[in-house]
Amino acid sequence: MFVDLVIRQLVHEPVMMLDLCAAPGGKSTALRAALPEGSLLFSNEPMRTRSQILAENIQKFGHPDMIVTNNYPRDYKKSKLQFDVILTDVPCSGEGMFRKDDGAIEEWSLQNVDNCWHLQREIVSDIWNCLKPGGILIYSTCTFN
């Protein structure tokens, strides 16, 4: 995974981090392993059913400095929480699936691309004020169209 390498390069002191769209938990466990001891990682998944899977996987990982949450980005906007690092692995329009799944081509539309673009902007806008001054925002998506 690439994001844990980024964390190891940039983060050398304990931090408070938010993995905003974390299910099923692979990124969060890799991130937590890469963070300095004393760091606290919030692993969040807005979709309830996916957050339950996330919670199970985080529990199996067994690191005590991880908190699983089930919030939408706008909920964090309302909070007073401030994070040193935020990872936003935002929803995408799915072009990367074309080579693996014939059905993905049939489901693709310009409207879906536009919807994803608006949702991505909304997510970043909602969590921006939760990033401490000088903090790190890691923006990730699998398709840029």
Regions found by a protein language model. Give the residues of each.
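S-adenosylmethionine
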Residues: 1-145
